[in-house]
């Protein structure tokens, strides 16, 4: 398999030019002498454990969501590519994949990272839906609200967007303490890992080939 052809499929949906200035999406390790790859592993984050598993499974390429800002020398025998904020912003990207997994049908684009579902639902019912993805989620409901009708979603770290829209509920993966204390909205912190791990299935769908999935688990118990 030509590694550049595979990456082109991802970049057609999540172009690199859309990444944030601080992001390091793209080729993390790109050995120009290696064009064809035999087996690919998909991972949320490339760690030592993920790298060793890829080697043990005879993978010669890893496609990950999170980029590496520093690359250990020993990783350089593995072709590594990441699509982080481009995939977060993309149509059917990280946040939209989360919404669809929850079986919400319609949503609107609030901004590059946030999608909004307009549907009246009880807080308890929404909590039960989210628990299917994140059993250990945290609920912030400072006003004891029982029903919401406009839900903002942002997979990953979305704390900065909680009060950026007129939604009355927000679902994200990381909520800062002081934001949680001060917000008037219903907020679900479902965990960074849980909110983004679903994107690996989307990567597989985009590539249209057999892949090896990493066995990553959330670091929080």
Which role does the model predict for each range below?
Residues 1-221:
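Active-site catalytic microenvironments in core metabolic enzymes, especially phosphate/sugar-handling
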